[in-house]
Amino acid sequence: MHAGAIGPLPVPSKSGSEQLIRHASLYLLERSLVRKGFDELILSRNPNDWTGFGPALEQWIEDTGKNLGHAALCAAGLIDFDAIVIDGALPAKIREQIVAVAQRHFAGLDQRGIAPLKIVAGTIGADARAMGGAALSLMANFAIDRDVLFKEAI
């Protein structure tokens, strides 16, 4: 069971469209940093301090935010969400910058027929993926009211 596999969502590319995971993933930043001479484990060795990565990080933030904004539109076309939460194994400052880019890009897309939604930064960090998957499985198997997790507005 997936907590919501968004990696395969289509996003625009030079060749037409490709999967989101090929345009908004930490491995892309890692590859870019290695090409610039950084150690391949630099992100995992310094999970809370990504200063000094310069243009490689800035470009990754821009590309990732843009593609997550597009993915948010795709997802909102299928399900009415109150919010899209962007979280993961990255410093809070970087997460906030990605959210700002995603919000800006989303605002510029054609949203006709889409219920209004917010794009917000999560607060869980590196454990977000595991906790999201675990929560859905626990709710599906043990909750009396399976909708309780999704009733509160964000």
Residue ranges of predicted features:
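ATP-binding/phosphotransfer module of carbohydrate and carboxylate kinases, centering on a glycine-rich
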Residues: 11-154
